């Protein structure tokens, strides 16, 4: 009887081990988008402050990504104040540039935006608005589609940007990849003024690479999730839309199976 029980425990242990080894990776993180932070706006300041507290209260979040329109007016003073608040986060955070974030004639170019980010040491120094980072076996690629000379609501991913993206997708071909950007290439709803220029070319590019599992975006101030050719396109609502909320995303990859992606909108309680 004793030997029988030992065999049962051995078999159970082997099953548990095999199940555990089959799971290639799991990660849980938050997406905050379209904060539109403004100076002298008590509501927006309070929303962002309470959002930071909410994010800090969740120990299971690996990091936070802000997917553009972090500030409402492209001025250094506004960006500095925004950074002052999000520096209270107790976990790593990453920034994407949106159409409200930069305006070269106003004195806040993409180059200067990146310089200010690097001054605050939010994460490792970056060379430009396009960059990558790794977390728990996943690769995240930040892709810039904003225009700094004449900012506008139409997203524009330059050829050199897409060429750079393709290089990264080849480089990280053995990793599950999540792309983070401001302008979606699969819109949550039809709004011509917010469309992305030649989105079909971008889609064709990622369709060539099996490692892309999701694309995160904002811009539309709307919640939307669509699957296209095996890639999960996630668009999240603006933080300042009533009720204020951000999105928690959990991704589980299992060998031999399609990735499982779970999302949850987390409401921010304003006190």
Regions found by a protein language model. Give the residues of each.
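Bacterial N-terminal signal peptides that target proteins for export
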Residues: 1-9
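Bacterial N-terminal signal peptides
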Residues: 8-18
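N-terminal active-site segment of His-dependent metallophosphoesterases
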Residues: 20-81, 128
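Active-site neighborhood of phospho(di)ester-bond hydrolases with catalytic His/Asp-centered motifs
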Residues: 31-33, 63-69, 93-99, 143, ...
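Surface-exposed cleft-lining segments at the edges of enzyme active sites
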Residues: 38-39, 69-71, 146-157, 186-191
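Extended active-site neighborhood of metal-dependent phosphoesterases/phosphodiesterases
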Residues: 76-166, 171, 201-211, 225-261
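Short acidic, glycine-rich surface-loop motifs adjacent to enzyme active sites
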Residues: 170-189
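Short, solvent-exposed aromatic-acidic interface loops
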Residues: 262-271
């Amino acid at each position: 009887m004793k030997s029988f029980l030992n065999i049962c425990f051995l078999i159970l242990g082997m099953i548990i081990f095999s199940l555990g080894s089959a799971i290639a990776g799991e990660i849980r993180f938050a997406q905050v988008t379209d904060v539109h932070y403004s100076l002298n706006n008590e509501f927006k300041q309070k929303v962002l402050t309470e959002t930071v507290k909410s994010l800090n209260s969740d120990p299971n979040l690996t990091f936070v990504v802000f997917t553009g329109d972090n500030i409402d007016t492209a001025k250094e003073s506004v960006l500095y104040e925004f950074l002052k608040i999000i520096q209270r986060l107790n976990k790593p955070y990453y920034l994407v540039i949106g159409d409200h974030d930069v305006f070269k004639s106003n004195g806040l170019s993409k180059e200067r935006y990146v310089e200010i980010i690097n001054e605050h040491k939010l994460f490792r120094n970056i060379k430009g608005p396009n960059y990558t980072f790794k977390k728990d076996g996943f690769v995240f690629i930040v892709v810039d589609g904003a225009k700094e000379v004449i900012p506008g609501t139409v997203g524009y991913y330059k050829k050199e940007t897409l060429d750079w993206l393709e290089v990264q997708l080849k480089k990280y071909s053995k990793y599950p990849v999540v792309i983070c950007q401001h302008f979606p290439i699969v819109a949550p709803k039809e709004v011509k003024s917010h469309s992305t220029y030649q989105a079909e070319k971008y889609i064709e590019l990622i369709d060539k690479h099996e490692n892309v599992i999701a694309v995160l975006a904002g811009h539309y101030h709307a919640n939307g999730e669509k699957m296209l050719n095996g890639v999960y396109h996630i668009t999240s609502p603006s933080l300042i839309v009533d009720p204020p909320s951000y999105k928690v995303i959990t991704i589980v990859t299992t060998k031999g199976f399609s990735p499982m992606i779970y999302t949850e909108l987390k409401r921010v309680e304003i006190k």
